Each structure stands twice: as structure tokens, then as C-alpha cells.
Amino acid sequence: MIDGKTANEIFDSIRQHIIAGTLRAEDSLPPVRELASELKVNRNTVAAAYKRLITAGLAQSLGRNGTVIKGSPSPVALEGGDPHTPLHDLSGGNPDPQRLPDLSRYFARLSRTPHLYGDAPVSPELHAWAARWLRDATPVAGEIDITSGAIDAIERLLCAHLLPGDSVAVEDPCFLSSINMLRYAGFSASPVSVDSEGMQPEKLERALNQGARAVILTPRAHNPTGCSLSARRAAALQNMLARYPQVVVIIDDHFALLSSSPWQPVIAQTTQHWAVIRSVSKTLGPDLRLAIVASDSATSAKLRLRLNAGSQWVSHLLQDLVYACLTDPEYQHRLTQTRLFYAARQQKLARALQQYGIAISPGDGVNAWLPLDTHSQATAFTLAKSGWLVREGEAFGVSAPSHGLRITLSTLNDSEINTLAADIHQALNR
């Protein structure tokens, strides 16, 4: 059934059988030695074909149990709420729409000069502002680039430095969009546990020793748990990463403009390739698809090549709109109020739950994390009967399901938080 004399020919033969349906998900491929004997080729030729199948996501190795055809990706959970739900939606991870800027106020400030092919990809004003903002966040002054959001930046950075099949260390539990991006880009997620102080250094070192070539780290407002790096934890991570200079370090500081937690440096001086990403989605709204990336010069060059091969640049209209918002003194004042409001939501829910003997750590960001001992479905269903739609935590798990609930607090007032706490208590004691 399988034929070919070279690794490419064997790969193409197996691929055609998958397309034709003669090889299906979970079907075992012949042992390397057996197929090599049948085709009268070297075993290394068959092994190379199988390795390419695995890298392409068409097969998976089961170790001593051989190599099997990989099934089509199963449906995955997506970030965002349900606009059609009759329930009070606390599942979406969205900012409060009432706290986003009125963009119409800034349209008159946009440049009337058309931008053409060959123009600088980053607007000069935004470039200068971003360089000042990120100067203290990087080991040395970084090159500034603009992407269509944080996940767009992370995917392009990984594809620039890594190959399909490479392992990437990520927090466990992990942001849904990061999980999905790694999956569809063909990378392998290597889970690293987090606690109230952030990613655990000893678990990260284990992942690096097992072959992870990059790490994606959230320094503040980790999604879904809300944890932020403590100074002690950041120093431990930085010291550990100094021993692995070849590892690509990507810092996803997505909540930088609204975080109530101080910035903690993690990138070591010895790290060869690094990037710090700060997006405006939670600040100006998810529809302003823009993230600012500061990186070392080699990483920036690779990123620009990937941008040039695709979208080339993020619309200068969006860039100018973001710059107008972020340099408006009135909106800066509103940002301060929003930062205090989101932090107060976290504290309020923690105190309200404490009255019922339920302890959670107040986090940072728009989401609260309620850890559970068992699967969250029953608790989420009980809360739904009380009128609340929350996000079940299992979808955020990388190595295993993460038992808990992610609850978006951004739109809740004090009275609603008190009611929610009472309903959580009832759901946990049903």
C-alpha cells in the first residue's frame, strides 16, 4: 500500500492514503524496520518520512507503541462571550464597554496624508511613544514593531525562530487563544504550573531541559488566574533563564496599561532572542487590533520579514488612532480610574466570598479565578440556573483539565458582586 524510495516519496504516499481515506485516524503505520524491508530502503529513510509526518501534524509517535495517523483537530473552546445568551454573561474576558474611549473624539486628529507602499511601517509618533514606554521593560533598547494584536505577534515570533513540532513552554492553565494558536501552528505546548506568584521556575527549567525552545510568559494579569509575578519570583525566573541563553523568551504583557501590579523584569542579559509585547485590546477595545513589540535586533528583523510577506503593516489609521487616544490627557485620567475600578472589582469579590468562608486570591485584570477540586461543569450549571454564565476552567488546561471557574468582573457593580458571591456559595454547597 505504501510505496516510495526516498523519504519524500514515502511521505507523499502516506499523505495520499490519508487524503483518500485508506488511512484513518488512529491507524498504525508499519514499524520502521518492517516498512524499510518491504520497500527495500534504509531504515533511516523510513524514519525520516515518519518524522516529517509527525512534524506536519499528520501522525503522532506513541513511543514504543509505534506511529499512528493523527485525527482531525477536535473543536476547541474560543475566547469571548455569548452575545445571544439570556444570562448575565461573565464568560467573555472582555473589558467594560462603557470604559472604552469614544473613538469619534479622535477622528479629527488622524493624518489626512495618504500612506503609500514604501512608507515606514510604524508611524513615527507612535514609534517614539512606544520606545519611551518600553525602554525600562527590556534588557537594552529594543527595536519597535507593530502587529495585529498580541497573539498575532506571538505566532509570528515563534514561526520566525522555531520549526513545526518544536516545544514551547507555556503557563498551565493557559490563555485559550495561545493554546489554539500553538495547536494550529504545529507547535507542542509544554505545560508549566503557575501559582499566586506566577510561573514556577523549577517547572519551567524542567520544560527547558526536556527540549522547549521558547517560553511565553505573562508577567501581569495572567489569564485565566489573574496572578502577577512577584519581585522574588521574577528574579528567580531571570536567574534561571540566564542559564539558557538560546531559549526564545516572549513576554506577553497584555494588561500593561491597566495593571495594578508593578512591572517585574524577567529577561536575562544573556538571553539572545527576546520580545516584550504590549497590546491595547483591554484598554482601547478588542477591535483595535494592535500590539507593540519591542525585541532584540535579530528578532525584529525576522519579525519584519514575516510581516512583509503577509500583511506588511498594521493600518496607519489604527496606529494614529491608538496614538491619539494614548496621548490624550483626558483619556489618561480615565485610564487611571479604570485601573482602580478593575482592581476594586477583584478585592470586592474576594471580600464577598470570604464572608461565606470561600478564599480566593484577588488577582489583576478583568477576570477572577475560582479554583475547584472537581470538574467545574456542575457548578457552572448551578450558577446558570441563578442567571450567571461563567467560563468553565477545564478548557484552559494544557497537561490536564484545570478545575475552576473564570469569572469576568469588568461590568459588575457592588450589588451584583454581592449577589454573585451568594450564588457561588449556594452552588458550591448544593
Swiss-Prot record:
GO terms for biological process: alpha-amino acid metabolic process; biosynthetic process; negative regulation of DNA-templated transcription. Disruption phenotype: Cells lacking this gene display a 80-fold increase in pdxK expression with respect to wild-type when grown in minimal medium. A much lower but significant 2/3-fold increase of expression is also observed for pdxY and pdxH. Residues 70-95 are annotated as: Disordered. Keywords: DNA-binding, Pyridoxal phosphate, Repressor, Transcription, Transcription regulation. Gene3D superfamilies: Type I PLP-dependent aspartate aminotransferase-like (Major domain), Winged helix-like DNA-binding domain superfamily/Winged helix DNA-binding domain. NCBIfam families: PRK15481.1 (NF012025). This is Vitamin B6 salvage pathway transcriptional repressor PtsJ. It comes from Salmonella typhimurium (strain LT2 / SGSC1412 / ATCC 700720). The lineage of its organism: Bacteria, Pseudomonadati, Pseudomonadota, Gammaproteobacteria, Enterobacterales.
